[in-house]
Swiss-Prot record:
Keywords: ATP-binding, Nucleotide-binding. The lineage of its organism: Archaea, Thermoproteota, Thermoprotei, Thermoproteales, Thermoproteaceae. Belongs to the UPF0200 family. It comes from Pyrobaculum aerophilum (strain ATCC 51768 / DSM 7523 / JCM 9630 / CIP 104966 / NBRC 100827 / IM2). ATP binds at G9, L10, P11, G12, S13, G14, K15, T16. It comes from the Archaea. One of its GO terms (molecular function) is ATP binding. Signal peptide: none annotated. This is UPF0200 protein PAE1629. SUPFAM superfamilies: P-loop containing nucleoside triphosphate hydrolases.
Length: 174
């Protein structure tokens, strides 16, 4: 059985929704975005600047190493917001085999979701949205698509449809 599930995808693709569904199936939930937002608050910076700064100061694995301080080997965990192959490698190094789920949705759908959720790090304009995508891709997010063990196309799926799909995936992992 695989105990470590990682969820990746561009902002607004539905990563957190997928990860929270997995959490309800008995996995402990951890968010790399929460790590960055907490560090941003501590530093008095925006989450975007903090994500870049952490990686520049301490390398591409900086955020995942911070998160790993809270995770115990052997726990069933879902990690929300993986950004690079290096982060997956760090998880594998400390926790064992990782099953990577990549969530995709169109730009239009993702932008609509982001502008409707009201988080402090959400874009205020379409140009900010595009810049955020570019930053995420520079972290190595695009490379994860070829490493994904499972891809969810989350364009118009209801929560119930996502729950059914994820339930089938988790059954196969047993």
């Amino acid at each position: 059985m695989i105990n470590v599930l990682a969820v990746a995808g561009l902002p607004g693709s539905g990563k957190t929704t997928v990860a929270r569904i997995i959490e309800r199936r008995g996995y402990l939930y951890y968010s790399l975005g929460d790590v960055v937002r907490a560090e941003a608050e501590r530093r008095g910076l925006t989450p975007d600047k903090t994500a870049v700064t952490m990686r520049l100061e301490r390398g591409r694995k900086a955020v995942i190493y911070e998160l790993l301080k809270s995770v115990k080997p052997g726990e069933k965990v879902v990690i929300d917001g993986i950004r690079s192959i290096e982060e997956v490698e760090a998880l594998e190094e400390f926790l064992g085999t990782v099953f990577l789920i990549y969530v995709v949705a169109s730009r239009k759908v993702r932008y609509q979701r982001l502008t409707g959720r009201g988080r402090s790090d959400d874009p205020l304009s379409f140009s900010q949205f595009l810049l955020r995508d570019l930053r995420e891709l520079r972290f190595g997010l695009a490379d994860l698509l070829s490493r994904a063990d499972y891809i969810i196309v989350n364009e118009t799926k209801s929560i119930e449809e996502l729950e059914q799909e994820i339930g089938k995936v988790l059954l196969e992992l047993r």
